[in-house]
């Protein structure tokens, strides 16, 4: 039984946002496999402003270790190439007309371990975000109890629901990390 002042669904929605943000962050990590999301963080200087890669080109994966970037405007090819070179991905673009090819080199063991550390950092940030949402929810419940808007039993029941949601989303975050870690360490 939810009170009008307390919305568990809002808390769950905010926790799900932390999981979605983690998935996006982990998607941009290099794993040794070619994925279009690898280029998502790259901004291209196009027509006087910075634009995401997806707004100036189409990225496809013709082979497991090759990205093919089809630039829509021929005049943007050099800008896209420059943006890739200046990114911290360490990739060397090869231009063929309006198409840019990116070979994704196999990562060595040290680089894989570095990527796993970065993945753990992103994951910890997501866990902290979920815990902040939990704290906000519990603080709100305590305020409602103090203002006599809900009974002590309702506060305890809803606090238990908030903790269950927290545990569920932390487990989901751990699952996302385990999957990404396996993908990174796979040779």
From Swiss-Prot:
It comes from the Bacteria. One of its GO terms (biological process) is cytoplasmic translational termination. GO terms for molecular function: ribosomal large subunit binding. It is found in: Cytoplasm. InterPro entries: Ribosome_recyc_fac (IPR002661), Ribosome_recyc_fac_dom (IPR023584), RRF_sf (IPR036191). Keywords: Cytoplasm, Protein biosynthesis. It holds the Pfam family RRF. One of its GO terms (cellular component) is cytosol. Responsible for the release of ribosomes from messenger RNA at the termination of protein biosynthesis. May increase the efficiency of translation by recycling ribosomes from one round of translation to another. NCBIfam families: frr. Belongs to the RRF family. This is Ribosome-recycling factor. It comes from Methylobacterium radiotolerans (strain ATCC 27329 / DSM 1819 / JCM 2831 / NBRC 15690 / NCIMB 10815 / 0-1).
């Amino acid at each position: 039984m939810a009170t009008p002042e307390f919305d568990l669904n809002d808390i769950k929605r905010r926790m799900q946002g932390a999981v979605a943000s983690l998935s996006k962050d982990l998607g941009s990590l290099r794993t040794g496999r070619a994925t279009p999301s690898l280029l998502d963080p790259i901004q291209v200087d196009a027509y006087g402003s910075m634009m995401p890669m997806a707004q100036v080109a189409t990225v496809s994966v013709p082979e497991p270790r090759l990205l093919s970037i089809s630039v829509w405007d021929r005049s943007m090819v050099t800008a896209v190439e420059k943006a890739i070179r200046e990114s911290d991905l360490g990739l060397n673009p090869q231009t063929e007309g309006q198409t840019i090819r990116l070979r994704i080199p196999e990562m060595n063991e040290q680089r894989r371990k570095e990527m796993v550390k970065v993945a753990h950092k992103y994951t910890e940030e997501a866990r902290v975000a979920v815990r902040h949402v939990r704290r906000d929810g519990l603080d709100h419940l305590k305020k409602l109890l103090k203002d006599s808007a809900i009974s002590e039993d309702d506060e305890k029941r809803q606090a238990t629901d908030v903790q269950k949601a927290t545990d569920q989303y932390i487990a989901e975050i751990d699952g996302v990390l385990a999957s990404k870690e396996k993908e990174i360490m796979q040779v």
